[in-house]
Amino acid sequence: MTTLYVDADACPVRAEAERVATRHRLRMAVVSNGGLRPSQNPLVETVIVPDGPDVADQWIAERAGRGDVVITADIPLAAKCVEAGARVLRHNGEAFTPANIGQQLAMRDLMADLRAANPLGAGGGGKPFSKADRARFLDALEREIRAAQRDAQG
């Protein structure tokens, strides 16, 4: 059975993911190291993991596999889940796939090196999350859930 895993730290689409999971009658695991209000939805499990680096990511990576969908912005977690056969989306609807995950990891490492080389440089952060991003995410999640359900059937 398909499970939707949400890496809940700084995830702006938890409510949307829950609505889609409910519509498809999917189990959903919302994983964080704390600070979340549990959902009253019986299909949604709120998983609170111990504090520590990458503990939530490890919890998801140990469980996600073929036939599942993972929502995360964490590229190393995405790589582990893609390798395990799961379908993986960023919260803006961009899919991590076997075809692009290597490039995504390389770009992440390059950007980390550039930030380390210029510790006084301006951070800037990412662009604000828009309605278009939300719509793109919802379309992509519908598509990936259907594909994951086909994957789970064989």
Swiss-Prot record:
It holds the Pfam family DUF188. InterPro entries: UPF0178 (IPR003791). Signal peptide: none annotated. Belongs to the UPF0178 family. NCBIfam families: PRK00124.1. This is UPF0178 protein SPO3827. It comes from Ruegeria pomeroyi (strain ATCC 700808 / DSM 15171 / DSS-3).
